[in-house]
């Protein structure tokens, strides 16, 4: 209150906001800052910084993969030995770093996340009944967190309609013998303007552990590169937010317009004693394909070169890992395509040279990347606002199965393989965004992947617009079904019928499968 009285006294009526000199005398600025900094506590010991986290606490962990994770604070939780934690995280990283450390020490009861990635330990604990796993679409997770921070108890979203997210029944906990103990609950559904939406509730936490780049001595925080991700919304959504940073600077170092998290959201700050900043998938421009990689497979290259024809000048597009990302290598230099990454980048560039590698700049596949001139970074809640709001013209992704009416399944094989839906459910939920699937026509065991009805849990219902395989290209009509529009020269219509487990029409203008030319 003393600070407010000073402000009221020192700001005369009618003073222009554009006056070049400060509104307060320097001595009053110093006094105001001194008064304000008392509400943000600074620590030197990570264990003391997480004081109050107890058995059964709900803890949000910022970061995406290994980028922007609060590694010192996670280590402090390990040291404290608190158990039965409910962890909210975008994904679970790797076995021996970040959240994986807490999983290995059996300190976590439940994980709420969107993607397991390559964390084999988490998948093993889950399938063995030692860990509860609440899989949530990444954009929905970001919005549930953001909603809590803004005082909104619930909201409606189109993401997940027609899937296990809406219907319930997604496995949360298995028994050691493999039978299901806990399943997800169905969502309330409501229709708005002819579309169906799910009711999702805000998610709160006792603590949020955040990784920033720098903080000033009043608690304002800034980030580097794509490390904003889930850190920004999480910092606003917990009862107590603890931010570890690489550097603490004097007040006034940051221009007011450059501050990413105002100190009103910050309770505790610590300068991390050390940072490993491990990179999950180090990828450089001159990286060679790993042994056994399919990158040079002729069939795969055929899909890539066909997929590249879907890009248009001025387009905003999101590309899944694998074939979709590789298709971007064939974008004509005469064309500008703005590539979006769910973790908070618009304007993805090529993979970096070895001397350009930056642990704070990764894509949604956790690969090191660069950003083109004019590109930008933002938090995960903003990223999915772009996606859900229909601001992308194209999303291209892989699939395990696609139905004849455009249903998509690509995130789970019940009881066997659990990777998570990541941002895929959000990406296919906007009616304004064209969805292109790139995949091999059949499985490794020669089973068709294009079916009358998907047998695996759906990612989206009637959402796919085009299917590209090494054999053919299908256009998808969500009410009439598939039409074969292009055919690879080594295939025949009879061959496609034999390897496709549903009926389809053949275009009267059927043509050879198109391929982008390198000089295009």
From Swiss-Prot:
Cellular component terms (Gene Ontology): mitochondrion; motile cilium
Pathways involved: Ketone metabolism; succinyl-CoA degradation; acetoacetyl-CoA from succinyl-CoA: step 1/1
* Positions of disulphide bridges: none
Q: Which stretch is the leader sequence?
A: none
Q: What's a GO biological-process term for it?
A: ketone body catabolic process
List the Gene3D superfamilies hit by this protein, alphabetically: Glutaconate Coenzyme A-transferase (3.40.1080.10)
Function in brief: Key enzyme for ketone body catabolism. Transfers the CoA moiety from succinate to acetoacetate. Formation of the enzyme-CoA intermediate proceeds via an unstable anhydride species formed between the carboxylate groups of the enzyme and substrate. Probably play and important roles in the energy metabolism of spermatozoa.
Q: What is this protein called?
A: Succinyl-CoA:3-ketoacid coenzyme A transferase 2B, mitochondrial
């Amino acid at each position: 209150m003393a600070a407010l009285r000073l402000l009221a006294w020192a700001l005369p009526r009618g003073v222009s906001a554009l006056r070049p000199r400060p509104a307060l005398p320097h001595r009053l600025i110093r006094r105001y800052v001194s008064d304000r900094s008392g509400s943000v506590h600074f620590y030197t010991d990570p264990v003391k910084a997480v004081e109050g986290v107890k058995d059964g606490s709900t803890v949000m962990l910022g970061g995406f993969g290994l980028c922007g994770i609060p590694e010192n604070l996670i280590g402090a939780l390990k040291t404290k030995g608190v158990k039965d934690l409910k962890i909210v995280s975008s994904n679970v990283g790797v076995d021996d770093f970040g959240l994986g450390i807490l999983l290995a020490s059996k300190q976590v009861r439940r994980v709420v996340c969107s993607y397991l990635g390559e964390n084999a330990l988490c998948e093993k604990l889950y399938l063995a009944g030692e860990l509860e796993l609440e899989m949530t679409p990444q954009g929905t997770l970001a919005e549930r967190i953001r909603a809590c921070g803004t005082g909104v108890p619930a909201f409606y979203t189109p993401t997940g309609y027609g899937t296990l997210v809406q219907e319930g029944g997604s496995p949360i906990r298995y028994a050691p013998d493999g039978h299901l103990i806990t399943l997800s609950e169905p969502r309330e559904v409501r229709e708005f303007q002819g579309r169906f939406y799910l009711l999702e509730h805000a998610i709160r936490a006792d603590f949020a552990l955040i990784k920033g780049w720098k903080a000033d001595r009043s608690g304002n925080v800034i980030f580097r590169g794509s490390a904003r991700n889930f850190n920004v919304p999480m910092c606003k959504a917990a009862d107590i937010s603890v931010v570890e940073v690489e550097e603490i600077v004097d007040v006034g170092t940051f221009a007011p317009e450059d501050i990413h998290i105002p100190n009103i959201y910050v309770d505790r700050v610590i300068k991390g004693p050390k940072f490993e900043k491990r990179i999950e998938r180090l990828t450089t421009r001159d990286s060679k394909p790993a042994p056994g990689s399919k990158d040079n497979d002729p069939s795969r290259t055929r899909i890539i070169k066909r997929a590249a024809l879907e890009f248009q000048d001025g387009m905003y597009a999101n590309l899944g890992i694998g074939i979709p990302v590789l298709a971007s290598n064939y974008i004509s230099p005469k064309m500008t395509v703005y590539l979006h990454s769910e973790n908070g980048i618009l304007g993805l560039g090529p993979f970096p040279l070895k001397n350009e590698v930056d642990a704070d700049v990764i894509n949604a596949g956790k690969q090191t990347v660069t950003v083109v001139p004019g590109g930008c970074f933002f938090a995960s809640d903003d990223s999915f606002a772009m996606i859900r709001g229909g601001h992308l013209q194209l999303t291209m992704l892989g699939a395990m199965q696609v139905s004849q009416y455009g249903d998509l399944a690509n995130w789970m094989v019940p009881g066997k393989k659990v990777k998570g839906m990541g941002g895929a459910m959000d990406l296919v939920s906007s009616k304004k965004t064209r969805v292109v699937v790139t995949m091999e026509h059949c499985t490794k065991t020669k089973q068709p992947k294009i079916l009358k009805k998907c047998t695996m849990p759906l990612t989206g219902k009637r959402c796919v617009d085009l299917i590209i395989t090494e054999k053919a290209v299908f256009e998808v009509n969500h009410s009439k079904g598939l039409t074969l529009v292009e055919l690879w020269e080594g295939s025949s219509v009879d061959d496609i019928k034999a390897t496709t487990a549903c009926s389809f029409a053949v275009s009267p203008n059927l043509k050879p499968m198109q391929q982008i030319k390198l000089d295009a």
